[in-house]
């Protein structure tokens, strides 16, 4: 196993890209610190670092829309990680399956899977 201390963090953080293992759809990206990576490996559930709240958070902690991590890959520069997951519910807090639900023109192209006001 790669030593998480050897990853190239910037200000203690590394980008975590989340992809649905089955469909290959990119679901989201978020920052992770070493603790988030370790907790993700330990529990099998995606954990991230919230820059706004300055704390560790488990994806789906409030909504129940967990990301069950099936595999973690490290990129060639060792400065980002890819989490291949089984997504439970939507990944986006706006109610969409993916955070990448709009194209450059602002057109909604993603699938809405829940109403945020019913969850948060």
Swiss-Prot record:
Residues annotated as binding Zn(2+): 76, 92, 99
Lineage top rank: taxon: Archaea
Major subcellular location class: cytoplasm
Family matches, as InterPro entries: PRA-CH (IPR026660), PRib_AMP_CycHydrolase_dom (IPR002496), PRib_AMP_CycHydrolase_sf (IPR038019)
Gene3D superfamilies (alphabetical): 4.10.80.70, Phosphoribosyl-AMP cyclohydrolase (3.10.20.810)
Known pathway: Amino-acid biosynthesis; L-histidine biosynthesis; L-histidine from 5-phospho-alpha-D-ribose 1-diphosphate: step 3/9
GO cellular component, one term: cytoplasm
Catalytic activity: 1-(5-phospho-beta-D-ribosyl)-5'-AMP + H2O = 1-(5-phospho-beta-D-ribosyl)-5-[(5-phospho-beta-D-ribosylamino)methylideneamino]imidazole-4-carboxamide
Biological process terms in GO annotation: L-histidine biosynthetic process
GO molecular function, one term: magnesium ion binding
Function: Catalyzes the hydrolysis of the adenine ring of phosphoribosyl-AMP.
Protein name: Phosphoribosyl-AMP cyclohydrolase
Gene source species: Methanosarcina mazei (strain ATCC BAA-159 / DSM 3647 / Goe1 / Go1 / JCM 11833 / OCM 88) (Methanosarcina frisia)
């Amino acid at each position: 196993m790669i030593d998480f201390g050897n990853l190239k963090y910037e200000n203690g953080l590394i980008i975590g890209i989340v992809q649905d293992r089955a469909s290959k759809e990119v679901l989201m990206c978020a920052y992770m610190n070493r603790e988030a990576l370790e907790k993700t490996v330990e529990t099998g559930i995606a954990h991230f670092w919230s820059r706004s709240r300055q704390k560790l958070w488990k994806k789906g902690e409030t909504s129940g829309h967990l990301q069950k991590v099936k595999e973690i890959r490290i990129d060639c520069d060792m400065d980002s990680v890819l989490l291949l997951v089984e997504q439970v519910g939507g990944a986006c807090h706006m109610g969409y399956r993916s955070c990448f639900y709009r194209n450059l023109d602002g057109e909604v192209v993603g699938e809405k899977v829940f109403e945020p006001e019913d969850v948060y």
